[in-house]
Amino acid sequence: MRDRTVALYARQGTGLGGQELPAVLSEAQVRQAEEQCGVEFPEDYRQYLLRVSAGGRVRRLRFDGARWDWEGAGFWDHEKLYVPFPDHDVALAASEDAWERRPKREDHPSDAAYQAEYDTWQEAADELEAARVAGAAFLHDDGCGFHTLLVVSGPMRGTMWFDGRATCDRLNPLLNDDRRAATFTEWYLDWFAHEESLTTPEQRRATYENWHAGVGAPIWYRWFAS
């Protein structure tokens, strides 16, 4: 699979041409990353790191001299990978309840009193929001504040999710053809098959128009319909 992925990245007209596919990691390196995170990565993602690449379609997992993390991740993004990924509806309800209790200036006798309560509320709201993605790695940056997540802890371990909170406040599972949350392997191989088939810029534009219309969309693009 690595050879085919290298060839895809080298091919012009794919949108990937000219990019270099990062090297694989060793078993020792993967274990170091897992020990630091306090988890064992889902087996298919582990095999990707060992046999295909430390990056590529996903953010590169690398050691910066002090710690292992995914390239481009915020310092606190992966602080609690060992915590089980929560039930989405329960976590969303807690977040919405917090926003309904957002302090209002008119309810306070002074600016100072309002700011003090607002700061306390903001800290609690931030913690609730972070808890919604505990146990999940920000594996791919989709731009505009959107991310694709790989769940590494809890009952949904091994499944792929889309973080659409930038606009809709929701986290949705990325569904396979059976309407179940896709695994990393399903997500990656589906992306690869679609990408490998797009050989010209014209074909790419036409295909993306179809996807946007809901026709033949790959797993990674299905968050609109999740």
Where are these regions (language model features)?
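Residue-identity detector for threonine
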Residues: 5, 14, 120, 148, ...
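Long, compositionally biased interface segments
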Residues: 168-226
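Basic, Gly/Ser/Thr-rich N-terminal segments that form RNA-phosphate-binding interfaces in CRISPR RAMP
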Residues: 64, 153-155, 185, 203
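A surface-exposed partner-binding patch
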Residues: 1-131, 135-140, 221, 225
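Low-complexity, glycine/alanine/valine/leucine- and proline-rich hydrophobic stretches
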Residues: 138, 146-170
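Generic detector of low-complexity/intrinsically disordered segments
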Residues: 63, 151-152, 162, 173-177, ...
